[in-house]
Amino acid sequence: MEYTELSAYDLPAGVVTSWTPRADAGRWQQDPRDLSPGHEAHLRDSEPGSWIGSVLRVPGPYEPEPLRRAVHAWMSRHEVLRTTVTRDAGAGWRRVTAPAEAVAVRDLVVGHLTAAQVTALLPSLLADVSPTAWPHCVLASVVPDQPADGFVLAFGADHSVMDAYSQLLWFEEIVSLYDAARRGVPDAELRALEVGSHVDFSAEDRKLAMTLAADGEPVHRWLDFLGPGATFPRYGADGVTHPAADAAEAARPQASRSAWLATVDQTDDLSARSRARGASAQSGVLAAFAHAARRVHGIDRLRFVLPMHTRYAPQHAAAVGWYVGLCPVDLDLDGVDPVLREVDAGGIGAKRVVDGTALTAAVERVHAAVAAGKPLVRYSFARIAELGGITDGPHLAVSYVDTRFVPGAERWSDWDARTLRSPAYGTDELYLWFLRTHDGLNVSTRYPDTPEAHVAMDALIEELRACFRAFGTAGLSEAVA
């Protein structure tokens, strides 16, 4: 499992078909449930052409009608895919929702294209979504010239209806629905799924957000984290990120990269050592990141935003929607020794081994830093920004997701499954997504496409790999403190 732009995925030559939900104008119903503050902020601030999605190779033969029924069942199950917004009389936004039976999934055969043509066309098909116009999710299929291994299916969605976990859930759900549709399972049975609605969640999120006050603790905590000027911290190394000098720099596409950092064995070892120290694998991975940043760039203090899920209620565990809050992390490793230290390995020279005492200190610092910010995750940052006069956005974001227990995760490699993000632009953001998978630990990153940033990211990723080589049964033993 990797998280990349679609251009990094190997698309075949074949027959391309777009799959688009449609609903008659008269079937939309006024919906009194409120939008979340985050949704409203997204309507105001989202960039044109921004989307997220997923792609996989569906096993089995391509059959258009079962695929249509599977896509319709998926959209019927998840109400957020059948809701949108319209302007109200006061120039604000109000919600309208279509019942499942009002939605039809229409296909349009584009035709047979070469692999290069498919690679050029598919991103534009999937980018045809917007937060202000339904549908907010569209799909496309590619039936290859040699369809023995199945066919490619991808979707693109606006972020207002989708988060990373929803992207991951889709793989198993759509393959299972397609298989059931091919077996003739009735539509009513295909649609049946007891799952919560993100529309309900959004209304509750707004209720909670409206209890916040400008002089309340959540707002003060965020303002303290941001500091003077209420600006988000940047990556501490010179030249990696910087404000765009002009419009041309702001419009420059960012570099995108995916790299495997550790084997399953190495990741499991770090996880076990972190748990033994009263923390989690997340703390261990973030400690490794902090160690690498300090070794490469001399950064003792890292301040970043950690996205975390808000799927607290069990009915939302398998729901499609945007269930994400922000955790401010202020991590200071001053006084902590390097996690790795060099020891004399005899005739083969010096080797780097894990310093147990330093690992304990680093993991404990990470655990405490995340725990300090975690209570703020449940509160809408959009509302906090409004109350606190915060107009800046995150410049350094670090995400960690353990994907191994998502339904179907053990089959993702067979399906060549991948989560997708659209290209980003500018010079002032560095995002890293750490994914723990059945194949090991991967990092996806986007960063400014500048020589300085490329050098910095090359060094950071190599140092992360070097760090993980010290873990696992093939690595070196932990040094005696």
Which residues are covered by each model-predicted region?
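Short amphipathic alpha-helices and their capping loops
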Residues: 1-47, 69-113, 195-255
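A short, small/polar-residue-rich loop/turn motif at beta-strand boundaries
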Residues: 1-30, 59-76, 92-136, 338-350, ...
